[in-house]
Amino acid sequence: MEAAAEPGNLAGVRHIILVLSGKGGVGKSTISTELALALRHAGKKVGILDVDLCGPSIPRMLGAQGRAVHQCDRGWAPVFLDREQSISLMSVGFLLEKPDEAVVWRGPKKNALIKQFVSDVAWGELDYLVVDTPPGTSDEHMATIEALRPYQPLGALVVTTPQAVSVGDVRRELTFCRKTGLRVMGIVENMSGFTCPHCTECTSVFSRGGGEELAQLAGVPFLGSVPLDPALMRTLEEGHDFIQEFPGSPAFAALTSIAQKILDATPACLP
């Protein structure tokens, strides 16, 4: 596909947030999805850019599998997820013939697609663009940061789980952010205990507090802990809106609190 005829498709995006994790399996895409939904329910217009090219799970989480991406006069039109067009999504998952098709590409081709996603998706006016990145640190992260740098991203959320091995990976992720000049907005600890679906009591499954302790040691904000919640897992599998359907759950309280902290940390120029 040729480059968009008119550059500057991110000109109408007020704030860009990258979501990172030091390793796979910590629920990074879950946090990206639910953060976007929470911001949307807070009255913001939100886009999600899924650059996790080898594991594009967000279309399924949002019930958008099988949707088609169309060309417009400015490049690609994102997939809108509601009638009001208040939340939109772009993912490599929309470009695959089958949802479970493997992306077997070398680095240069991946980097080229990331740059094309940044330049050619016609987002229009957005309050927030949430960028879901691959796990770890790689050329794809560098390509994403370099492509977004002219638009001055608000910063990065780093997702971890309570286990020491995950916390150790996050240390490397924080170092990566410092070396690339990417501000760390805060750390989110996911899978922090299990919420019983009957009594809503939260029981520790792994160790607890590793994310908060790491945030204190690194001198970055700790944004909150999100418990394992069967209702959250079910809505992700079914492509439903957890924030809308389970407003009384502990996971809802945690996710909306994180979103509010993001809103509070946003410069006052955003209405």
From Swiss-Prot:
Keyword tRNA-binding: no
Location within or outside the cell: Nucleus; Cytoplasm, Cytoskeleton, Microtubule organizing center, Centrosome; Cytoplasm; Cytoplasm, Cytoskeleton, Cilium axoneme
Cofactor: record remark: Binds 4 [4Fe-4S] clusters per heterotetramer. Contains two stable clusters in the N-termini of NUBP1 and two labile, bridging clusters between subunits of the NUBP1-NUBP2 heterotetramer.
Source domain of life: Eukaryota
Keywords assigned: 4Fe-4S, Acetylation, ATP-binding, Cell projection, Cilium, Cilium biogenesis/degradation, Cytoplasm, Cytoskeleton, Iron, Iron-sulfur, Metal-binding, Nucleotide-binding, Nucleus
Cofactor: [4Fe-4S] cluster
Modified residue annotations for N-acetylmethionine: M1
CDD domains: Mrp_NBP35
GO biological process: cell projection organization; iron-sulfur cluster assembly
GO molecular function: 4 iron, 4 sulfur cluster binding; ATP binding; ATP-dependent FeS chaperone activity; iron-sulfur cluster binding; metal ion binding; nucleotide binding
PROSITE patterns linked to this entry: MRP
Residues reported in the UniProt entry to bind [4Fe-4S] cluster: C196, C199
Tissue distribution: Widely expressed with highest expression in skeletal muscle.
Record-level GO cellular component terms: centriole; cilium; cytosol; nucleoplasm; spindle pole centrosome
Protein family according to the UniProt entry: Belongs to the Mrp/NBP35 ATP-binding proteins family. NUBP2/CFD1 subfamily.
Functional note: Component of the cytosolic iron-sulfur (Fe/S) protein assembly (CIA) machinery. Required for maturation of extramitochondrial Fe-S proteins. The NUBP1-NUBP2 heterotetramer forms a Fe-S scaffold complex, mediating the de novo assembly of an Fe-S cluster and its transfer to target apoproteins. Negatively regulates cilium formation and structure.
Protein name: Cytosolic Fe-S cluster assembly factor NUBP2
Gene: NUBP2
